[in-house]
Regions:
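Bacterial N-terminal signal peptides
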Residues: 7-15
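C-terminal cap of thioredoxin/glutaredoxin-like
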Residues: 152-219
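Generic anion/oxyanion-binding catalytic loop in active/binding sites
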Residues: 8, 97, 129-132, 146, ...
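Structural alpha/beta surface segment adjacent to cysteine/selenocysteine redox centers
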Residues: 70-144, 213
Length: 219
């Protein structure tokens, strides 16, 4: 190898090393390094909700949703991913938002649970993210047709939907919605104290970083 060629190679190698060193000293722009602010990135109850203690000491994350929701499906994906990554630290539970006059989502959700079709609840949440689709599928005949295509028999679903067991579960959903002051959806409560809404849950990296920040505060 000629001396000139060797010098050229060494020049490029040294230049690459300097560039690597310069990059390594750039400040990290990682979401995880941020300090998040109450009232901006998350909210807090003035009086935290008292939850029963868990024997496994995992922190509860309560996810309130509605099928008529543009952000709820992506929020569910974020929360499920976070709970899977941190299964030894947190436990995720889903609750449908319900009021005395708006019981549809809760009744459908608990009916699908009773039929061991939780996966269809998630599919329906995704399907109804668009307002036009929710308007369509909130009509029972259209919903039954959609469920039939997913393998749910019409009469079996209707029998479950109108059962006393489901009515009682929906009544409990109404109570929780009122007691927890759920005023929007998605609405996420962390350990009965911290609250996340669509303003945080619209972005996965941002939401995951805020979740980590709040869970670390609780431990």
């Amino acid at each position: 190898m000629s001396r000139l060629r060797l010098l050229i190679i060494l020049f490029f190698i040294s230049g690459f090393a300097v560039a690597q060193e310069s990059v390594s000293h750039l400040p990290a722009l990682d979401e995880a390094s941020r300090v998040f602010e109450e009232g901006k990135d998350y909210f807090s109850y003035q009086e935290p909700i008292t939850l029963p203690p868990r024997k496994d000491h995992r922190i509860p994350i309560q996810f309130f949703f509605d099928y008529d929701c543009r952000v709820c499906s992506s929020a569910q994906d974020i929360l499920e991913l976070y709970s899977q990554i941190n299964r030894d630290r947190v436990v995720l539970t889903e609750y449908p938002v319900a009021t005395a006059k708006t019981r549809f989502s809760a009744t459908v959700f608990y009916s699908l649970q009773a039929l061991n079709a939780d996966n269809l609840s998630s599919a329906l949440l995704f399907e109804t993210a668009e307002k036009s689709q929710y308007t369509k599928l909130s009509q029972m005949d259209n919903l039954l047709t959609w469920l039939g295509r997913q393998g749910i028999e019409r009469n079996r679903f209707l029998q479950t939907y109108t059962s006393e067991q489901i009515k009682q579960q929906v009544d409990e959903a109404v109570r929780l919605t009122e007691d927890y002051g759920v005023f929007t959806f998605p609405y996420v409560i962390i350990d009965g104290k911290y609250v996340l809404t669509a303003s945080t849950l619209y972005n996965d990296d941002y939401a995951l970083a805020v979740l980590d920040f709040l869970i670390n505060k609780k431990q």
